[in-house]
């Protein structure tokens, strides 16, 4: 696994300008559900228009900021709960090296997990498993992390995330299993931190259970800031949403993370404010590699790339786009969609 990750050490770093530029010309892992017709929130034709630069992305900046903020926290918790180290969380894997030009994947990372065998099955070993296993083994896995702001967490992988995970597995030959990590975080004031269920109930519904962990996110200005820091964990819901939208402008702020279970605010210069977090659900769901996945679906990726090239090369891009939308039908059949549902079982 480590040798594989080192192959991409010089790839564009995730979320860098070079990375964004490449993704505008490729089908990335997170694009794949839309291209395959499996994303209920964004169709083939919407993402085609976005990549052809026919209109700006309709980004939910607050949700994007939330996901970015808590991706780092989720990695820290995964390392703690599974006694592992996540690597390769900033690389970009171009599919050209495996014969899939135009397709790429930017994984949330890779790590080794311990599987324990008990009652005729294997399970992922965590610090919460007080079990004497009959046997154990250590395996490398691909990591995919989600931390939804509002969506309810279920004990399964949403079908529209499965293509992203299978893409990462297909472009990572040494890896045969992925894990889908989904965490439910809640915001709290600094005074509410600790082993209790107190949270900011203006932002989130009340919680009845105790948290698995807690910590602090500190926001610093890139300019000199001398005002007293604010406890953002006590804001009302609308003001906190505005804060998340402001944090989307990453060049104005730097973000600092406490270690899990810390409750003391850090002393550092130019602190604008901080807020506490608690995690109440932290699911780790195994996903096995589907060997034929990318081979079977790559023709649809190629068709998308041809459509994209046709639009960009046209003297009348919007007119060409409209013709493509009117002339083509859905790229996937009902059987294809059923096959993806089967992967979840």
Swiss-Prot record:
Location within or outside the cell: Host cytoplasm
Recorded GO cellular component terms are: host cell cytoplasm
Query: Which UniProt key words apply to this protein?
Result: Host cytoplasm, Host-virus interaction, Inhibition of host NF-kappa-B by virus
UniProt keyword annotation of Signal present: no
Q: Which Pfam families match?
A: YqaJ
> Per the UniProt entry, what is one GO biological process?
symbiont-mediated suppression of host NF-kappaB cascade
Q: Does the keyword Protein transport apply?
A: no
**Subunit-level organization:** Interacts with IKKA/CHUK and IKBKB.
Similarity annotation: Belongs to the asfivirus D345L family.
Function noted in UniProt: Plays a role in the negative regulation of host NF-kappa-B signaling pathway. Mechanistically, recruits host IKKA/CHUK and IKBKB to suppress their kinase activity towards NFKBIA.
Instruction: State the name under which the record lists this protein.
Output: Protein D345L
Classification of source organism: Viruses, Varidnaviria, Bamfordvirae, Nucleocytoviricota, Pokkesviricetes
């Amino acid at each position: 696994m480590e040798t594989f990750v080192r192959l991409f050490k010089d790839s564009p770093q995730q979320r860098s300008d070079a990375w964004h530029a490449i993704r505008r010309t490729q089908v990335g892992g997170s694009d794949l559900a839309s291209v395959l017709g499996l994303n209920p929130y964004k169709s083939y034709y919407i993402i085609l228009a976005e990549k052809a630069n026919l209109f700006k992305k309709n980004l939910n900046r607050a949700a994007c900021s939330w996901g970015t903020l808590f991706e780092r926290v989720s990695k820290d918790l995964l390392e703690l709960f599974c006694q592992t180290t996540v690597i390769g969380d900033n690389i970009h894997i171009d599919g050209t090296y495996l014969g899939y030009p135009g397709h790429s994947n930017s994984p949330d990372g890779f790590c080794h997990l311990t599987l324990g065998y008990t009652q005729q099955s294997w399970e992922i070993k965590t610090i919460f498993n007080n079990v004497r296993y009959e046997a154990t083994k250590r395996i490398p896995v691909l990591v995919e992390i989600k931390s939804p702001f509002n969506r309810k967490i279920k004990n399964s992988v949403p079908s529209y995330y499965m293509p992203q995970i299978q893409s990462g597995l297909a472009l990572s030959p040494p890896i045969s299993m992925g894990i889908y990590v989904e965490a439910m975080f809640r915001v709290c004031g600094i005074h509410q931190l600790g082993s209790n269920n107190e949270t900011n109930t203006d932002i989130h519904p009340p919680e009845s259970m105790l948290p698995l962990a807690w910590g602090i996110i500190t926001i610093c200005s890139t300019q000199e800031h001398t005002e007293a820091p604010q406890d953002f964990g006590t804001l009302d819901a609308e003001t906190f949403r505005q804060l998340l939208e402001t944090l989307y402008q990453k060049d104005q702020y730097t973000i600092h993370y406490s270690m899990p279970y810390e409750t003391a605010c850090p002393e550092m210069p130019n602190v604008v404010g901080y807020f506490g977090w608690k995690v109440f659900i932290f699911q780790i769901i195994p996903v096995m590699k589907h060997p034929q996945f990318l081979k079977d679906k790559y023709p649809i990726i190629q068709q998308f790339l041809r459509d994209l090239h046709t639009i960009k090369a046209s003297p009348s891009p919007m007119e060409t786009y409209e013709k493509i939308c009117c002339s083509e039908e859905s790229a996937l059949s009902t059987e294809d969609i059923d096959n993806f549902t089967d992967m979840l079982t």
